[in-house]
Amino acid sequence: MHSKTSYLIVRLALGLSMFGHGLVRLPKLEAFSQGLVKSFENSMMPEVLTLPFSYILPFGELIFGALLVIGLFTRVAVLGIAAILLALIFGSTLVENWGAITAQLVHVAFVAYLSHHIKDNSYALDRFVYKN
């Protein structure tokens, strides 16, 4: 398979995953937030950090996922998703949710691929924004 096509497939897969995570959480944002805060109530993470994160997370997933799907500001989207995933991995360790870390690490592998092979991002709106 051509490297540019491979890049597109990975970019779309990660973008749709992140977009979908955010999309399904937004209609039930309050319940999602309450559930996340509750899951951290016995952890070292203070609620003053957990509560705002629980409201910001779905928007970050949705926005960075959408940018990745359309290939606009791909480098920024990849870095934003990396930051989200690192925060999620840290949070998962604090509540000893070892099962979640596996899926998060798979997502990180896709992020690393996209970051490392950014030169193959040809089928994207970035081509029209950055004409160099």
Regions found by a protein language model. Name each.
Residues 30-41:
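Peri-membrane helix termini and adjoining interfacial loops of integral membrane proteins
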